[in-house]
């Protein structure tokens, strides 16, 4: 465990502990050279501990994967320090709170706010899927979305993200958060791909807009208007399509999903009724004009 006040590599001063996991701690640190705050993740190495070795290698792979990424909704990795008994990963310090805490405090979020978040999340997932090879995030959930004081969001924790292998039949390891994870994440149903992230995003949007945690009873994704009749039928259709059991029945890309989200009102029953009314009015006026000739 790092000691408060110590310097790492002669420039990162440890200020305080801000997070703790089973085999790692996260600290707030000040870069003495740049006068800038960073988050520093410390992962301990334990000799002759195979589980720890897997954790360390996974952390290094995660850091190296993220180090090459550059997107406004992703934290940056700026330094990886590999010591004899510990690894330090230096990354953006993200102020704010995860959306699961927002849900616990405030309940269901306003539909328009959720739509805005959905657009941002589609954008960052599409960015990941466009990498070469594509990166499949696999762990979309409110706990991994940080809401910053300025209202922007950041996607965090790439612990189970993986690079898509074109010739693999299925994932080598079954990982995911039950309730949010797609069926194919638990093996025997093919390799996870971009449609897996679309499923997880659909469940996340469901939780955000209804306040109903998919990890709690009734453990099912109901149509969102079952919980709140005032919600959009267009958004309801989008979430239901995202969360189809069969990946072939979901949106096939985040670009396709984003288009649907941007035009969700056009699939709304109220909108369609208004458009039909306008059309009937137009035809009525046109008919009246023809008759008067």
Question: Where are each of the predicted segments found?
Answer:
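C-terminal lobe helix-coil module of Hanks-type protein kinase domains
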Residues: 176-266
